[in-house]
Amino acid sequence: MREKDAECYTLRVRLYTMDGTRLKDSPDALLTYYQEVKQPWKLQRSRITFSAALGLPQPAGNPHCFDYADYLKSCDIRLIGTLTSFQLAETEENSFASQLWRRYERFLIRQKFLFAENLKPESKGLLMGVLFGETAYLDEDAIQQFRDNGTAHILAVSGLHVGILYGLYQRLTRNRTSAPCLALLGLFLFSYGTLSAWSPSTVRAVLMIVMSVAGRLLDLRYDMLTALSAVCLLLILDNPDVILGTAFQMSFLAICSIAFFEKILPKQLPDSLASALAVNLGLILYQAYQFHTVSLVSLVANIPVIYLTGYFVPLAMLCFLFFGICGELYAQITPFLDAMARLLLFVNNGFTLGGASAVDVTRPPLWLTIFFLGGAFFAASETCLLLRLRKKRKQICGCLLLILLLALGMQGLTYSPITHDDVIFVDVGQGDGIHLRCGGKNLLIDGGGSIRYDVGQKTLKPYFLGNGVSSIDLALATHRHTDHYLGQSQLAENFRVRKRQVGLMAGMTIRFSKDENVWLETLWPLTLAEDPQQEENHSCSVFMLHYRGYRVLITGDLDEEGELAMLAYYQGRNETERLRADVLKVGHHGSKTSSAAAFLDVVNPRIAVIQVGKNNYGHPSPEVLERLTARGVQVFRNDVHGAIGLQFQGKNGIRVDTMRKAAA
């Protein structure tokens, strides 16, 4: 169990029947609890009874974006749910050792909670992040500064932290392998692993230390890559999905980088600088691929930050040990710890360069990322060195070709057709967001939005960068309601949007591509509302996308009143044909106040798309769904299908791609 924030707890539970039998093939579940928990450490390894609806986490809604379901799989969690209440059902373990184990774990978790409560607010976030990987105490701006500087790894308990503490242990014990020293080492590794929730990087570091010590005891040579491979195999055998986690990938990639690159760097470089440079070389393209950003100061910033962390971690751990054991020593050490925390933050902030320490980049192709890393590791290997010395160029080229073929194969296995579609109805939650592209140009209509969540920064920007879009040529808004306009405004604050327009009226035509067969026609309204801030749904802009012979009607939040008024206007001009469309973006998220029967009869779509997310409004309305299905219209929804893509295939019709497959 770990605290997520001030108002919410997350509990990882293992499911059993009421008689204490573990459910067959039952995965772990992650439960969210929104009430206060007194003495939460008592829940560690306790049995609880609860009633909750458990479900599967949804896969990613948009292509090449964060996949929460995959993240949970990497942690060996398959189910999620929300707790309203629970009761402790404590049962004693069968053996004394298991009882002792459980009580010691609870003691550690208790100390961590109480330790956090006694820290000063200005240093709590950094200390809990660096020491235990608990970033919930840090504000988002501080975390972003660490990310931009390439120093965020100090906020996730990693091999760096375990290595620092292991190095301190070696100095204190003079690297002895006597029984008491080994017992002390085992206790330390278990304790720190428990406090850091056994993150993949912690598990990797702990197991590699165990192998190193075992090698000394058995008088066997320790090889870093062999140990790394063995640990990797053990973790994959335990949970094959662990490879989906970025923490796992970065941890093992960082060690591979040190193993391959550090030995080819100039010998004059200090070990700490050589390791930092090797890790940066190995992770730069991976970070661009995974996080769509490249730090310009990472190498320079890591030198002082890692140096200070080398002193900060032992001091923080010493402070934690004295907490609750010797209050006087704790009180004497705390001022030094606070001062070092402020110094570490000051040094890190100094490298942000006013927000210019990192640049956003579009996601490089997967095949290029794999080929770059595989080729670089091969070029730095002893095998390649021997082949070069023997002038066996054909074998070198053959190895590189094999790496390239493997990279291309991986690219093929992860291919997503929706990434290349002409029109994508982006999953922005409860809101509208439509991405159009043609001839290298990109147009965005609406952009979702929520007062509780930055859709522009956290949804739209990762979507565009992850799918190779570095700028938006034109952004249009049907109207200024939050769930259409706010996300677009947030995007424009930290992403290049060349031009924005809102309040378009009937008769306006927009050509955003050199292709003469692609244009956007505005059909409604005839006049703008007097007060744009109070504009009603019946007067929002309505667009008809003409795309190489196909037509897509985009209605924003147009309600029944607006639909019938627009219909009457075009009927009066004998131009109802202008309303006919192959695809209808259903108005107002499928609300019962939209999609009038007469309107649907005139538009006569074959495909309908409802942009809707989890909501309390009853969207989409069952009546609207019934009207559409009664007319033989194929219905696609963002809340069910995730992002929805349209590929116009000329005489072959329209291909619809979705991120998720709907349940049968």
PLM feature spans:
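Hydrophobic alpha-helical segments of integral membrane proteins
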Residues: 96, 100-119, 126-127, 134, ...
